[in-house]
């Protein structure tokens, strides 16, 4: 992380959100045939939030994996003050972050006017309000731990957040080990253009880095170069790859 050409922090963890889904459903020819017959649409990894919602609704509230229990559409962090904001921003980015209008996502960089009320964010909120129709019972009060356990325990078709739910799903005690897939966050078929005040009717995906960690070196350190050299090692690709798969955390 730098400002005006001077490095102040070294990124060591990029906490991006991504989509988790049940491969045994999405890639299942019989399920694809049934979904096509019932909806007229293809069952595939969703590339837009509208598709995500349609599929999640279809697979909500019935036993689609044959375990004797009802499954649901999506596990999401919806609980107030429990990282709910992160889930909302991930849903908002595709509608609001237009590559034709570079600059701020949360604020206009020239005026610092908040952008949270623009139609892109409103469209995402409209989708999210509808999501209460395809989450598990009590899902509107799910915190991060609930989302992890719900998807990781085989309760839902989809979830999206950090690595935790995927890692949980791949544990030896998970009923869905090796039955989950990962993909980029869904996008949108339109994106708000704040410069002309209109929707751009174009496909848009905007992967969102939610959170992240960085390390700095103390100003009074006598070995700044050595410290930064260690950080380069600590944050190398091999260490990141190893870190992703360790434990029930992202």
Model-derived regions, located:
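A local structural motif
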Residues: 33-45, 110-113, 129-143, 155, ...
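A ligand-binding cleft/hinge motif common to bilobed small-molecule-binding domains
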Residues: 152, 161-177, 189
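Glycine-centered hinge/linker elements that transmit conformational signals in sensory
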Residues: 49-59, 87, 94-141, 184-190
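Short helices/loops that flank or line small-molecule/ion binding pockets
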Residues: 26, 51-59, 145-159
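Paired acidic/hydrophobic, glycine-rich loop segments that form the ligand-binding mouth/hinge
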Residues: 157-162, 181
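Acidic, glycine-anchored loop motifs typical of Ca2+
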Residues: 39-41, 63-70
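Periplasmic solute-binding protein
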Residues: 1-41, 53, 76-110, 205-218
């Amino acid at each position: 992380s730098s400002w005006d050409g001077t490095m102040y922090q070294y990124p060591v963890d990029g906490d991006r959100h991504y989509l988790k889904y049940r491969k045994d459903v999405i890639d299942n020819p019989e399920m694809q045939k049934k979904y096509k017959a019932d909806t007229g649409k293809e069952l595939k990894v969703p590339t837009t939030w509208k598709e995500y919602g349609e599929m999640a609704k279809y697979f909500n509230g019935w036993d689609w994996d044959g375990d004797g229990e009802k499954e649901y559409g999506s596990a999401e962090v919806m609980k107030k003050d429990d990282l709910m904001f992160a889930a909302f921003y991930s849903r908002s980015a595709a509608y609001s972050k237009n590559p034709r209008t570079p600059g701020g996502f949360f604020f206009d960089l020239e005026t610092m006017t908040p952008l949270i009320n623009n139609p892109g964010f409103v469209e995402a909120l409209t989708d999210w309000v509808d999501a209460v129709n395809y989450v598990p019972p009590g899902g509107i009060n799910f915190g991060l731990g609930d989302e992890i356990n719900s998807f990781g325990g085989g309760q839902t078709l989809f979830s999206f957040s950090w690595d935790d739910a995927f890692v949980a799903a791949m544990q030896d005690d998970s009923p869905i080990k090796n039955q989950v897939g990962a993909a980029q966050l869904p996008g949108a078929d339109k994106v708000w253009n704040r410069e002309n005040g209109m929707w751009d009717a174009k496909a848009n995906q905007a992967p969102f880095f939610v959170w992240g960690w960085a390390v700095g070196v103390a100003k009074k350190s006598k070995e700044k170069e050595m410290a930064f050299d260690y950080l380069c090692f600590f944050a190398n690709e091999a260490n990141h790859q190893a870190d992703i798969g360790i434990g029930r955390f992202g």
